[in-house]
Amino acid sequence: MTRPHRILVLAAVTGVLVGLAVAAFEQVVGRWLLEWTLDLPAGLRALAPAVGVALAWVGLRYVGRGATPALADEYLDAYHGRDGAVPLEPLPGKIVAAGATLGLGGAMGFEGPSIYLGAAIGSFVRRRFPQLIDGRDQRVLLVAGAAAGVAAIFKAPATGAVFAVEVPYQEDSASRAAVPAIVAAAASYLTFVLFFGLHRLFPIQGNPDLEARELLGALAMGLLAGLGARAFAAMVRASKRIAGYTEPWKRVTACGLGLAAVAAGTWLVYDRPLSLGPGYGAVQWTQTASRSFGLIVLLLLVRAVATSLTIAAGGAGGIFIPLFVEGWILGTAVEVVVNSNTLLFPVIGAAAFLGAGYRTPIAAIVFVAEATGRPGYIVPALIATGVGQLVMGRQSVTASQLVRREDPVELRDARPVADALAPPPDPVSPDAPVATPDWTVGQARSTLVESAAPYVAVVDGDRVVGIVTAASILALDD
């Protein structure tokens, strides 16, 4: 079996395992625990998220042995790390924390633990079959596993593959893993839907007839979504700082009380627990006939505050769906202002907000098409998402992204010339170009090319400390 075929087989195995793991998490946490929480009496339901973040801290502290609540960021950190694998020791504690946070109503998404489970399983498969994976492919199954996690939880295989490949960089992609990611996403999706069926996450009926005003509206929607995503990203980063630097009992108590107050206030205003859970209930509420502009804007703020408090308390979950929900609610507010009922603005608002927040415009557009089942929204979503990217700039909800892939030649050229030294000949040619020890490899390489000399002599005062040759420079790439 050739190397590419081995990789694809392992990607398919990874996808099946991830599909099973995500299905188990969804059943236990999403279908049992969260539904039980939402059926509690109003007072107990308001307190549930506070209990959830407290249990999350216990899980991370004692089961995870001091692990952090990071989930999707663990995938990014592993991808950019030296060995390209997720450490498996904290996995039980992180999953306990995610289950407690999400199952008891924390305002975060199920894709966080799904991505983490996928990346961890991909790392496990790679370690289990080291003889089948060479150094060039050490991150491939990591990406494939993350793709499988997203594909399963959202029933969106294309989104899973694109997101996992796109999210490591703001202006680049993990393109080497694209085909294995597709295979793993397909295998995971097929496994997951065997248990939970084929229905879409946000089904929408009909397609709007697009006119010039809708396309102009998409420009405005992208601007608003970009500004909103910048504000939301700032809130997320501030919440993560609080979670990282505040004493656990203080943050859990303060944020838990805040979550209880938000939940109680939301119930009084909306007669529904719209601040709890990932936000699917909030999306459904925006499609009711009783919506008003003021209540929609208030809900936009309520969901943002609930998510921020959950993160600040140290809860474990995802940001993907909260971004989508914020964009959907913002788009609904615009739809009310322009007196439309096509759901065009909620859909493209969700795409633009999500794409800007995570710096994944392609994945956001694909997700909207898959989750709603309406590819006719893609053109205005493209426009809105493009504008949102421009407004977002270099901001992101995660600090674990890199802007772009580091060029190995640029990295090599930035190294000190001492790293490329070879022993000098005896004698050194008097015609050899001269460098000093404070030069970089790039400067020495340029001098070699321009002079066509066999080597550059590195001189410290009156002493030749070594030479730089083409071979000694290329040896740095090994």
Feature-to-residue mapping (PLM):
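Alpha-helical transmembrane segments and immediately membrane-proximal extracytoplasmic
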Residues: 1-431, 436-438, 450-456, 460-461, ...
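Amphipathic alpha-helical regulatory segments at dimerization interfaces
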Residues: 443-450
